[in-house]
Amino acid sequence: MKYTVIITKDEDGYYVVNVPALPGCFTQGKTKKEALINIKEAIRAYIESLKKHNEKIPRDNAEEITVHA
């Protein structure tokens, strides 16, 4: 499954990543690469937990749009 992720850099210099389609699924890393590796693991664990509890796995219906202002 593919999921849209949002990655931002916090005031301490860490990259924070979250998955809008999976509430509460987020992680961080010292580098973008580390943060993206971590979010893949977090997504797998999140989905595994949903399956274990016989819960529906959300589909990603996000649309990516960049707006320049």
From Swiss-Prot:
Gene3D superfamilies xrefs: 3.30.160.250
Pfam families recorded: HicB_lk_antitox
InterPro entries cross-referenced by the UniProt entry: HicB-like, TA_system_antitoxin, TTHA1013/TTHA0281-like
Domain of life: Archaea
SUPFAM superfamilies: TTHA1013/TTHA0281-like
Family from the record: Belongs to the UPF0150 family.
PANTHER family (UniProt xref): ANTITOXIN HICB, UPF0150 PROTEIN SSL0259
Protein name, entry field: UPF0150 protein Ta0767
